[in-house]
Amino acid sequence: SIPDKWNDGEDDQDKEYIKLTYFDLALRKWVTQAIVVENGKETVTQTGHTPEQDPEPVVKVELNRKKLSSLTVKFKYSIRITNQGDIAGYAKEITDYVPEGLKFVAEDNKGWTDEGNNVISTKLLENKLLQPGESAYVEVTLTWINGKDNLGLKTNIAEISEDYNDKGAHDIDSTPDNKVPEEDDQDDAPVLISISTGEARIYYALGFAVLITIAGGIILIKKFVL
């Protein structure tokens, strides 16, 4: 062997390869259903949205003013946690920030806890070990606070608020429970509530619409990009 000179085959040199691994949990949230109840009759509209839509189209519900007092409107959301890294780990807690104008009803949300101040949380996935590439799902339902002045855009936000892996690795591109919208452990889902003048209006500009007649009242579930 010749010191300080690289010659293949000499025994005074060797190579060592290191594989870098990382921990990365990502969250996606989207509206799956718009639910309208009038006098005990429930009508469910599937939005057809998927977690890959970014940004997600707004789900619009247009209500007949004359029927307003007899209506209950709910929105069902799905939350997907995906392990995008190389290290298996857990989403120990998910926190959801309920927007003004919507409310959390415990009876609709088994496994969720009301933390107060329009914040709810769940540990439904705390014991679910997510292997690299694996996903797990939870759902949450929020109810519109009925009122002619409670209209407009309502944006619901969810975030991974606690994670864990047995390597002690931090998420490579997110910090749990820090409310930073640019990070991939947080996502939002928008809905829009409006009042009609009595006649149904269907807009064709962007997206598509589904028209539903409920006991004489007209409700427009419209999905479009702002």
What is each of the regions a protein language model found here?
Residues 1-58, 159-198:
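Extracellular/luminal low-complexity Ser/Thr/Pro-rich, glycosylation-prone repeat/linker regions
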Residues 32, 41-44, 48-49, 90-132:
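A surface/secretory-pathway sequence property marking extracellular, secreted
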Residues 39-40, 66-72, 133, 198:
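Solvent-exposed, conformationally flexible loop/turn segments
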Residues 57-90:
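Short beta-strand elements of extracellular/lumenal beta-sandwich folds
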Residues 73-77, 124-154, 162-165:
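Low-complexity, intrinsically disordered segments enriched in Ser/Thr together with acidic residues
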Residues 83-87, 98, 146-148:
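Short, acidic/polar linear motifs in exposed loop/turn regions
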Residues 196-210:
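Juxtamembrane/start-of-transmembrane alpha-helix segments at the extracytoplasmic/lumenal side
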Residues 212-226:
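C-terminal membrane-anchoring or membrane-association module
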